[in-house]
Amino acid sequence: MKPWSKTWTFYDGDWLEGNPPLAGPRSAAMWLATTVFDGARAFEGATPDIDRHVARVNRSAAAMGLKPVVGEDTWLGLVKDGLKRFDADKALYIKPMYWAEQSGVVPVAPDPDSTRWCLCLYELPMPPEEGLAITLSPFRKPTAETAPVDAKAGCLYPNNARAGVEAHARGFDNAIMLDVLGNVAELATSNVFMAKDGVVFTPAPNGMFLDGITRQRVVRLLRESGVEVVEKTLSYRDFLEADEIFSSGNAAKVHPVKRIDERALQPGPLYRRARKLYWEFAHG
């Protein structure tokens, strides 16, 4: 097993180093997946949209039947304190979390009064600006009738993970996932954009994928810079015929796609503008 990178977690009033055991085999979180989290980044001295990330984890908790017991200002203060435990030049992943310790009114439901929480920060380098090779996944996104898609919930990620693993087995880095209607939703690990004839397109949020904070920021920054951004229903064929494809998400922020199936792509001007605008925003 690979060693963990440098990690600090605030739990129950203390900062704990490493990967502390916070749940046991009877914990609802352990065997019933009653967890929500958010992911923010610290890099190059910036923590872009950290306020929106901590607000979202509280909304996710409520959507999952947990109690969002930590105020947003408290989260932000703890993030500031946690950052001091790392070298200033290190890129970090910032992960506020809630989970249920016990079951509730039915055995598989979380007991909101047993809500636990922590804030975990760990070193995670920003990935190099290398393009991704992507393909179409056979796995699809769930709907609000089948999964808690209105929360950033841990239970949603095994479906994304199997899409990623299946794509890797075929020699790709990531995969486009469709919704149940057969339209493009997102990549297995991030939101997705395409450009065609000078216009940027991205799937319109429809309740079947997370409308990411970085996605929203990229859309806004591009529009404010004068770029036309269209949110609409898109097919896989649209992406196969795109001039550019790029992704947005917490791990890499804005990242290019270099290949879709067997068709090679180059990082184009709209991707480069999106990335430049985001980095300027992050450091502004």
What are the language-model segments listed below?
Residues 1-81, 99, 108-284:
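Helix-start/capping segments and mature chain N-termini
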Residues 85-97:
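Ordered, amphipathic secondary-structure segments that act as subunit-interaction surfaces
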